[in-house]
A protein has these predicted regions:
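C-terminal output helix
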Residues: 93, 111-121
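Two-component/phosphorelay signaling modules centered on CheY-like receiver
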Residues: 18-36, 101
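Active-site beta3 strand of CheY-like receiver
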Residues: 51-57
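Acidic catalytic/metal-coordinating carboxylates
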Residues: 39-43, 66-69
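Receiver (REC) domain active-site loop signature in two-component systems and cognate sites
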Residues: 62
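Alpha4 helix (beta4-alpha4-beta5 surface) of REC/receiver domains from two-component response regulators
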Residues: 69, 90-105
Length: 138
């Protein structure tokens, strides 16, 4: 868990299905991360522009914008943000497209708690160096 002198990392979870959002939140919050929920790609982009987000989890299939489209647009706003795509269609084409857009990883649905946590921790360590402590308060 994050210590009192550190703010927890914030994880943006984007999925049009509230059950899927809640399932991912139930995995990452007990590990000490703060979650921000979005139900669409447009909402996710607004959140990334307006709030401090340290990692993003996107569903592949959402109305109006796919997870890949969100990822592509996001790269113009925050090129370094680690992004993980969550999809029931984890085929070679989707995976190749995701990595071309610099996704950190692709997690197949239904999600596995251990896979999600392991992938989140690895992404945070790679970008920030500390998977639990978060950022030091100013």
């Amino acid at each position: 868990m994050a210590s009192k002198e550190h703010e927890p990392y914030s994880i943006l979870i984007t999925d049009e299905d509230s059950g899927s959002r809640d399932a991912l939140r139930a995995i990452v919050e007990p590990a000490g991360y703060r979650t921000i929920l979005a139900s669409s790609g447009e909402e996710a982009l607004d959140i990334v522009r307006d709030e401090e987000v340290h990692l993003a989890l996107f569903d592949m299939h959402m109305p109006r914008m796919t997870g890949l489209e969100v990822l592509e647009m996001l790269r113009s706003v925050n090129i370094l943000l680690p992004c993980i795509l969550v999809t029931a269609d984890a085929n070679e084409v989707v995976i190749r497209q995701a990595f071309k857009l610099r996704a950190y990883s692709v997690i197949p649905k239904p999600v596995n708690k251990n896979v999600v946590l392991h992938t989140v921790v690895r992404a945070l360590v790679r970008v920030y160096g500390d998977p639990q402590g978060g950022l030091a308060k100013d």
